[in-house]
């Protein structure tokens, strides 16, 4: 089979205005970024059409280093729905450069189920990440300047909370000291970098309903505390308007196309392990304004992306998914059943059977939200008929719909069974109205504990002294009504990446808490999760090159 990049180059792309017109967007509303990419104004959102559209969330079993293929399944499902005559649009997140050049490689789907132009989407795309990075670091520069210019007046901050961001994986930037040298270099202070997908600006962009809401949220960003324990925000700097200007284009959703020429919105890119893991509300609603079926995904496993999709994105936006599709692979399930990474391509029925406990736990959790769930098995060439039969029988025993997804190798034709299952389930057994894991009026501890115990399976929740002090500040600020966004490893229900499967009865430790006052959520950091990843021993960058003007190695 051809490589992803070879398949992408073999597709004869439609002009982006043709793609827009195919779903009902007028040509004059299309702002071209080249021939095959466009920005679409969010003013085209029609809330009445949003209510009538069928929103489908695609999530997955707990992530493994072998990959699950959630984005490929999401794109494939949209292709399959279009194959059976439904007007379907996929709405995804933008890839981050860090993982593209690190361990993961590209994030535009795979095989014959990709969003295109793949190279541009995986690299700089429309510059949204650049704008977010610039806006975030502009706040850092303006804050440092404010402190430098006002130090003679005796003004200072007891604690500076605002860090910097870059869209790279660079462990050496996690903790730094700025302002070294002469006094003219600024105030010496500890700082550090997070990766751009963990930026509060990224979360704000993805949760804002319009430019005015974007500005309001930026104004509320908490930068630090004064010596008399008063919050110091972007509003106090007086630069919310300037920062919003940097994002005036980035807030518009991006329109591209799939390998079969159907529409795809790709906008926003928070990670699900260290942020809330969902594409922008605006892009989702724009897709729902023009599509009868909209397929969206949430990052990593259902314990991370799906939980945050329901408890944060849907709570903030009023969105109600009609169905949740959970993606599983035989390889991933075998790994959760105790099979080592180097042996998961070999037949192992016992390992597969044990790994099904991970799938079962995710399905129980998804049902706790009132969701109707169906399973998509992303088929790999090494999967055996016996393994597929075990998976089918298991789903039948659970009373869960099941279909095999072959979109990677066959495009939309390989997802027709999945598409028919989705349509039939929505028509005959749609999800109930969402039931959130916690109430707005619950305390921060109650919210964390309900997620950790009810969804992860923890039995004891512990807090560092830093986390406890942060909670006191949150209570003092009167923002306990914010939802919680738990940052933890993607490889386990617990905070320990080495514990696979369906672990229960463990201690769950909250190391720190970050107040995202602009994004209006509380980020609780569990275990040793880092908001600036590092590069692996053999980064994907070693395999990326340009030969005769053509990019090689992106996948």
Curated annotation (Swiss-Prot):
Annotated EC: 6.3.4.3
Domain of life the protein comes from: Bacteria
Keywords: ATP-binding, Ligase, Nucleotide-binding, One-carbon metabolism
Catalytic reactions of this protein: (6S)-5,6,7,8-tetrahydrofolate + formate + ATP = (6R)-10-formyltetrahydrofolate + ADP + phosphate
GO BP terms in the entry: tetrahydrofolate interconversion
Pathways per UniProt: One-carbon metabolism; tetrahydrofolate interconversion
Example of a GO MF term: ATP binding
Natural source organism: Bacteroides thetaiotaomicron (strain ATCC 29148 / DSM 2079 / JCM 5827 / CCUG 10774 / NCTC 10582 / VPI-5482 / E50)
Disulfide bonds listed in the record: none
Protein name in the entry: Formate--tetrahydrofolate ligase
Residues at which ATP binds: 64-71
Family the UniProt entry places it in: Belongs to the formate--tetrahydrofolate ligase family.
